[in-house]
């Protein structure tokens, strides 16, 4: 069921976005440790990560991001994908909402999903996320 929902979200976003007006971006990083929400994801070892994004003039976007991980349970890769909509109003207020899936190939029990809403103005911003399929406690 999850894969069907993911496919539907990507299909909707990709059909609504003209490839001629789309902006493609990529990124890569080498870090001394991958820390997420205050916890190491690589057992305090180096991480290599990278991703690809596509965004349309309409504000629709989707992308993917990956990194090595080390939890001691067989998971070696985190593969995230996301889709959303972002815009800035004439008064300078910006907003962003979307869906984010964290997946761990070979360790499906670690997979989880979030929806998020971000609001910003000038140099200030706030993002609220809510888990849709919460990850297990990794303390």
Where are these regions (language model features)?
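Repetitive helical segments and hydrophobic/amphipathic motifs
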Residues: 11-15
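Outer-membrane beta-barrel proteins
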Residues: 2-8, 18-139
């Amino acid at each position: 069921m999850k894969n069907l929902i993911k496919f539907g979200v990507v299909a909707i976003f990709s059909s609504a976005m003209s490839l001629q007006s789309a902006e493609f971006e990529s990124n890569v990083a080498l870090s001394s440790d991958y820390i997420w929400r205050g916890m190491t994801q690589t057992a305090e070892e180096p991480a290599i990560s990278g991703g690809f994004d596509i965004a349309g003039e309409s504000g629709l976007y989707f992308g993917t991001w990956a990194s090595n991980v080390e939890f001691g349970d067989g998971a070696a890769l985190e593969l995230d994908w996301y889709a959303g909509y972002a815009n800035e109003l004439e008064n300078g207020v910006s907003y962003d909402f979307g869906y984010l899936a964290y997946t761990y190939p070979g360790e499906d029990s670690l997979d989880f999903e979030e929806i998020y809403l971000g609001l910003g103005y000038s140099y200030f911003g706030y993002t609220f996320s809510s888990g849709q399929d919460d990850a297990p406690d990794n303390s």
